[in-house]
Amino acid sequence: MKIQSILTVLSSVYFLCVSTVAAQSEPELPKGRLLYSDGRHVDCYVISYRAGVATYRTNMKSLNILQTKKPALEAIYFYEPQIFTDAMNLYRAKNYGEAKAKFAECEVSFKSVDSLPDNYATLAGFYKMECSRRSGDLDALSAELEKYRKDGLTRDNHYLQLEVYTFWEAVRLKDWARIDRLATGDSWQGRKVPSELRVQLEYCHALALDELAKEGPKEDSSRWGPVINAYNRVLSADATASIDLVLKAANNLMRIYAEDEGVQLAIKNWKTEHEKVSSVGYQKLMEANTLAQFYKQVGFHEIQPLITDYEKFLNYGQVKVETAAVTKPDAGAEPDVEKAAEAPEAE
């Protein structure tokens, strides 16, 4: 009797351990709501969706696996999973490395429903690519975009961002002439896009013109005019839409001013008998001064301090930018593509 009792206890412990391990290893299923054409709805955990057939459980512990299909099944709405929420919080905090790992995990976990609209596998894959772009890993972005399945996207802004990736791919390849053709072509000229996307377009174009100007004849100083205008368009697109790109544009613009021989001469002759306020170099020095003042007034220097060569522009100027007229950007409040879809277009 004692031996039998011991065996019974051991068997119970064994099956308890097996059940616990199985429960722990079972992947999280997407929680959703099945919407039927007759008005009914059922909250459930979706196992898969293929060819119009949804396979699901009514709860995670249920052993009953059920199926429903079109036309009785009209749509499936998904609740936001915790892993996606965590990933988005990291993303908005600019912690792109950890956010990308979470998005990748979410993408794999919910792959079985990636053919449905607004599924979290497709959304996670999209934001995984955004993490690569924002962190500057264009090689990773290129590889991820090649494998990406976009069918589950429903927002126009997401599809627009996929189109803008064409510019980033050209940046990766350093195909500056192609970027110039894209930016000035019929597809984008005059096209209304949200500020978050407009900043990307203008920055890629400005970067391309910058690189093309470097290849031009040094004696032709006029070649920098279009570059300066292009970087100014980045700054005017929306200073809070994509802070990282705006900072790069501002610093590149000040680099151009600092390297300009006319500006250097204007600095040398500042407040001397040789000063020529009507010269092109003097006018550019005033532009550089205004930009440096703006950079500090809006708080950009708190995110990325001005280097000494650019801060010296503050010593040369006649007009001061009023602090009250400028709103400081919040570096941590950069809107994402999804939120931008809900905002009015800036262009």
What residue ranges belong to the model's regions?
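TPR/TPR-like alpha-solenoid repeats
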Residues: 131, 169, 208, 215, ...
